[in-house]
């Protein structure tokens, strides 16, 4: 049964691929393939609550329409490991031809991915990863370099926002997810380029705006001299802005997000309007993931890149207004 998702999203320009050096061996490629057959491509999404994930779903849905051999089915993991595990196991039982997955958390979803691989179903992990290595424990990974994206945000803070130094706070995503750990470490390493910067607070807000608002409000009370806050996604950046505004510090604190989503509630608009200092795009990887799926199922490829890394773009006051006008929502 085809699942259709009526979701708001944006169609952004697809960047060039940066392909990992390792390749998957033939044993990991689909058992059945060819251009004349129909294939069920199942996607287990971590949740539908985050705007970024809606954006991913929308991109996949729109792009899959151009591939007549594909029947794309999307399931909402609802931010619950047990729910997502059950959905993946159901896909395996149904005998889908290829599994895409953005795991809610790494460790809890690893056994389900292992079961899919043992059943002979190619698995492409999108945005987030389970434990193990792409090309070995699962077929391939498609996503941004979370560490590098956050490192660039840290470097931007060190060189542009706080060249004379100052106090900085960090709002981390869900600590048990790979992007949260990678972005936290990347930003902290990036700001080390300026020895005068001090990270005075780190707080997990689980990617959620309300938790970010509460956390940053408490941080501002404990550290009133904070000049910049790095939020690991745009939703937490939005919560940080509300906290700063509530503390009477609107316009006094540089807010940095990650995702670079378009639209009225997205990070691009927030930077263009002057509410935030910057955000860094995290492309959906939808086109790249479907391209790998085509190679595996339609082209009968005997090897595919184990990692496809999509590059980021810094959105600042220099380019935000122009991008906001160009991007569709």
Enumerate the predicted regions with their spans.
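Extracytoplasmic "Venus flytrap"
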Residues: 29-63, 67, 72-90, 96, ...
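Short, solvent-exposed amphipathic alpha-helices that sit
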Residues: 52-66, 70, 149-156, 178-197, ...
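Hydrophobic beta-strand scaffold residues
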Residues: 72, 120-123, 199
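Hydrophobic alpha-helical segments within soluble ligand-binding/sensing domains
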Residues: 34-35, 41, 84, 141-167, ...
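Flexible loop/hinge segments that line or gate small-molecule binding clefts
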Residues: 106-107, 111-148, 159, 167, ...
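Hydrophobic alpha-helical
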Residues: 103-118, 187, 201, 205-266
């Amino acid at each position: 049964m085809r699942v259709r998702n009526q979701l708001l999203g944006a169609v952004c320009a697809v960047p060039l691929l940066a392909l990992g050096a390792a390749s998957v061996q033939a044993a990991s490629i689909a058992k059945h393939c060819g251009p004349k057959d129909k294939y069920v491509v199942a996607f287990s999404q971590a949740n539908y609550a985050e705007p970024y994930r809606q954006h991913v779903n929308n991109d996949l849905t729109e792009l899959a329409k151009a591939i007549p051999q594909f029947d794309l089915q999307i399931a909402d993991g609802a931010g619950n490991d047990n729910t997502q595990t059950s959905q993946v196991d159901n896909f395996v039982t149904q005998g889908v031809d290829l599994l895409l997955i953005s795991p809610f958390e790494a460790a809890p979803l690893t056994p389900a991915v292992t079961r899919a691989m043992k059943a002979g179903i190619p698995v492409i992990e999108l945005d987030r990863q389970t434990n193990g290595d792409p090309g070995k424990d699962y077929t391939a990974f498609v996503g941004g370099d979370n560490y590098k994206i956050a490192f660039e945000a840290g470097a931007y803070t060190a060189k542009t926002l706080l060249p004379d130094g100052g106090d900085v706070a960090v709002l981390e995503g869900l600590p048990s997810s790979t992007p949260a750990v990678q972005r936290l470490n990347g930003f902290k390493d990036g700001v080390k380029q300026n020895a005068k910067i001090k990270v005075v607070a780190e707080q997990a807000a689980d990617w959620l705006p309300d938790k970010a608002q509460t956390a940053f409000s408490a941080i501002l009370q404990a550290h009133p001299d904070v000049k910049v806050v790095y939020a690991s996604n745009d939703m937490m950046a939005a919560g940080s802005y509300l906290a700063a505004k509530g503390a009477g510090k609107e316009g006094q604190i540089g807010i940095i997000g990650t995702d670079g989503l378009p639209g009225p509630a997205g990070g691009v608009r927030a930077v263009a309007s002057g509410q935030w200092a910057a955000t860094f795009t995290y492309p959906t990887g939808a086109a790249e993931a479907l391209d790998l799926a085509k190679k595996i199922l339609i082209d009968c490829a005997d090897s595919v890149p184990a990692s496809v890394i999509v590059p980021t773009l810094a959105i600042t006051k220099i380019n935000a207004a122009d991008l906001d006008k160009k991007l569709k929502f």
